Each structure stands twice: as C-alpha cells, then as structure tokens.
Amino acid sequence: MDDLLAELKSEMDAAGVDADVEFSLPTLELTAALDATIDDTSQLYTDDPPHHYTDTPLTGDDLPLLEAWLDDAQLHGVGDDIIAEYIDEVLLVLITVRGGACGKELLQDVRRLFGADVSPGTMYPHLKQLADAGLLEMSELTKRKVYRVADAQAAIEHVDSVVLQLLTFAVGLQTIMADCIVNQSADPQPQDE
C-alpha cells in the first residue's frame, strides 16, 4: 500500500499538483469504498421487500466502509444536539451503508458511531418523514419495519448538499475566529490600573 501511495504522490507531483497532501490507509479505504458505493448504487436496495430480515450489528468486519470510524473518539465528541439536528442525514448515510435497517439497528448504530443517545421518539418521526419525502422505502414485517434507500442518487445529493453547507459554515466561522484572535493579539486591551 505504501508503494501505491508513493506512486500516487509522484503522479500528482508530475502533473504539477502543488499541494501538501498526506494520505492515511483508513482515509483511502473509506474514500475508495465511498466511490464504489456512489458508482454502483444498484446494491444499496432491492425492489422486492425482504421475506425475512435479521438484525445485523454494525461492526468493522461486517461494514468495512465504516471500520475506520467505529468507536472513534472524535465522532463521540460530537454533541447529541448536533446529531439530533442532522439526524436525517445520519439516518440516510447509515441506511445507505447497510443497504437497509430497522429502527433498533439505527439507534444502536448512532450510539456506536457517535456515542449519542437519540430517543426513538426523535428518530422514528424522521424515518417516516424521509419515507414520505420519497428518500426511503419502508417494508413492514411481523415485528419491525425495515427502511431502505428508495433513490440512492437523491439520498446522496441530499446528504452532500447539507455537508457542503456545514463545511462552508465551519470554515467561515473558523476564519472569522482566527481574524478575531489576530486582531486581539495585535491590539491588546489596555490594562486597568
């Protein structure tokens, strides 16, 4: 893998890409898996509802796409209020990665990925709204409902749009904060005597 990274870096240098880029194996695996998911969305859902559904715990072995992120301290540092604010996007990503999930699995996934305790009273209305909006399909089984992505491209575009807005906001806020720090250090407040 190191040879591939070195080859990629040298190709970037030869192409005149002027950037200090660092690669890590989990980042590349996640990016490659995401690219494969976006290119081949046919496996994300099926047209026929399943006849039998078995709970599958979210593990690194079962879902290599999220392996680098499971039990990650940075993700566990995200506040429950932020998770609740963006629960639609979180649910769409988790259901897309899984290819389908029931509510119990999604609650466990959110807890495992983010350390957040989202209540069923918060999550289930959002699943219904996503289904009503045509982003999810819901199959009713004997003891549970299974949610699948109805239109993978629409789901990806929705999440991508929200993520872009969040990144733009975060970069803008961080830039303003950096300017404030620079201005304060350049113009110290007079001390009271």
From Swiss-Prot:
Amino acids binding DNA: K143, R144, K145, V146, Y147, R148
CDD domains: HTH_ARSR
Activity regulation, per record: Degraded once GvpD is translated; degradation requires 'Arg-494' of GvpD; tested in transgenic H.volcanii. Fusion of green fluorescent protein to its C-terminus partially protects it from degradation.
Further information: Encoded in a 14-gene locus called c-vac which produces cylindrical gas vesicles only in the stationary growth phase.
Reported impact of V159D: No longer activates transcription, does form probable dimer
Record flagged with keyword Transcription regulation: yes
Subcellular location field: Cytoplasm
A molecular function (GO) term: DNA binding
Highest taxon of the lineage: Archaea
Keywords: Activator, Cytoplasm, DNA-binding, Plasmid, Transcription, Transcription regulation
Functional summary from the UniProt entry: Plays a regulatory role in gas vesicle synthesis, required to activate transcription of the c-gvpA operon. Gas vesicles are hollow, gas filled proteinaceous nanostructures found in several microbial planktonic microorganisms. They allow positioning of halobacteria at the optimal depth for growth in the poorly aerated, shallow brine pools of their habitat.
Pfam families: PadR
The organism of origin for this protein: Halobacterium salinarum (strain ATCC 700922 / JCM 11081 / NRC-1)
Signal sequence residues: none
Subunit-level organization: Homodimer. Interacts with endogenous GvpD, also with GvpD from H.mediterranei.
Main localisation: cytoplasm
Entry-linked InterPro entries: ArsR-like_HTH, Tscrpt_reg_PadR_N, WH-like_DNA-bd_sf, WH_DNA-bd_sf
A GO cellular component entry from the record: cytoplasm
Name of this chain's protein: Transcriptional activator GvpE2
Region (Leucine-zipper): 153-184
Induction of expression: In PHH4 (a deletion of the p-vac locus) detected starting late in exponential growth, increasing in level by stationary phase and remaining at that level (at protein level). Transcribed in all growth phases, maximal expression in mid-stationary phase. An unstable 6kb transcript able to cover gvpD-gvpE-gvpF-gvpG-gvpH-gvpI-gvpJ-gvpK-gvpL-gvpM is detected, as well as smaller transcripts. Not translated in strain PHH1, which has an intact p-vac locus. Gas vesicles appear earlier when grown in static culture, possibly due to O(2)-limitation.
UniProt keyword Lipid biosynthesis present: no
